Amino acid sequence: SEVLPSETMAQAVELIETVEETGLVYAYAENYCYMDLTFEMWRRYREGDIGDVTYAEGEYIHDCAACWLDITYGDPNHWRNHLCPTFYCTHSLGPIMTITGHRPVQVVGFENPPIEEFYHLGHAGGHASGIEMVTLDNGATVKSIHGALKREPAQTSYKVFGTKGFLGTCADAEGEKVRLYQESATQTCAAENRYI
């Protein structure tokens, strides 16, 4: 699946148990992991350009109020109308996990205040945005933020700080790019800082 396969933790547990019992493979194809910029970040990270991750950020901001009735088909029972703010972290957190190859071992979630407009559009909880602070299996910390915060156009942003440098997405007049910073092997104050 490309979107959330479960609406509740109970459904998520049921999916995991079914996979374990049957021995089948379940593939969750989080599409933001395979976009050009995040794929390039993955490639450079795997080549060791910035060392091991020490801190990272993933951001997916999409104020979808204008298209809400279209994507929920106006159905008050549609899964999006009952989604907890921290459940849709796939676009913000998925690429960070894919880029670094590290797994979360501890997660603390927060939600921002509900958005009044979304109550009128059918969302039972006001479609608040979610934030997660995640500890990875190597001890690194990740901040993930996602949801319907007010801004246009929608934005995704990824930053990975490593033991030897930095990789991050950025946008300028020429479009979106990946920024790479690498410490010099001979002098820590001299560095390579470029767009790739």
Where are these regions (language model features)?
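C-terminal glycine/acidic-rich active-site capping loop/insertion
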Residues: N31, L136, K159, K164-I196
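Predominantly a Rossmann-like dinucleotide-binding segment in NAD(P)-dependent oxidoreductases
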Residues: L24-V25, Y32-G125
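Acidic/polar loop patches that form or flank catalytic/metal-binding clefts of enzymes
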Residues: H102-G109, T141-K143, F166-C170
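Glycine-rich phosphate/pyrophosphate-binding beta-alpha loops
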Residues: T90, I145-P153
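Active-site beta-strand termini and strand-to-loop segments that position acidic
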Residues: G125-H127, E132-G139, V160-T163
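Beta-strand-loop-alpha-helix segment that lines the small-molecule cofactor/substrate pocket
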Residues: S1-C33, G48
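Hydrophobic residues in well-ordered beta-strands that form the structural core
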Residues: S1, Y26-Y28, E57, S144, ...
